[in-house]
């Protein structure tokens, strides 16, 4: 059974990698099709948040998501656990 479990785990790993790549591709497509102001908005949000909390540049993510007839601006900010500046 050890060999079968080993082969099965590779399938799960391959499936996980495939799912991750699909997510990355979908995000890249969203960024290409999104408005030109999104990267600037992301940088400006980062600068404002940095005034209050010490965060990295990759901690702020701005995405435009289509939800039926509406476009939804999805802003994700990963804050540090300590919350100190």
Swiss-Prot record:
Q: Name one Pfam family in it.
A: MinE
Give UniProt keywords alphabetically: Cell cycle, Cell division
Q: Extract one GO cellular component term from the record.
A: plasma membrane
- Where in the sequence is the signal peptide annotated? none
Query: What does the entry give for GO biological process?
Result: division septum site selection; regulation of division septum assembly
Q: Which InterPro entries match?
A: MinE, MinE_sf
What SUPFAM superfamilies does its record include?
Cell division protein MinE topological specificity domain
Task: Name the NCBIfam families on file.
Answer: minE (TIGR01215), PRK00296.1 (NF001422)
What this chain does, per the record?
A: Prevents the cell division inhibition by proteins MinC and MinD at internal division sites while permitting inhibition at polar sites. This ensures cell division at the proper site by restricting the formation of a division septum at the midpoint of the long axis of the cell.
The UniProt similarity line reads:
Belongs to the MinE family.
Q: What is this protein called?
A: Cell division topological specificity factor
Supply the source organism for this entry.
Answer: Xanthomonas campestris pv. campestris (strain ATCC 33913 / DSM 3586 / NCPPB 528 / LMG 568 / P 25)
């Amino acid at each position: 059974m050890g060999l079968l479990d080993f082969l099965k785990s590779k399938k799960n790993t391959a499936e996980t990698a495939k799912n991750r790549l699909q997510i990355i591709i979908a995000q890249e497509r969203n960024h290409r099709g999104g408005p030109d102001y999104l990267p600037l908005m992301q940088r400006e949000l980062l600068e404002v948040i940095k005034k209050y909390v010490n965060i990295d540049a990759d901690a702020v993510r701005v995405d435009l998501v289509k939800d039926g007839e509406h476009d939804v601006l999805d802003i994700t900010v990963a804050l540090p656990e300590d919350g100190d500046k």
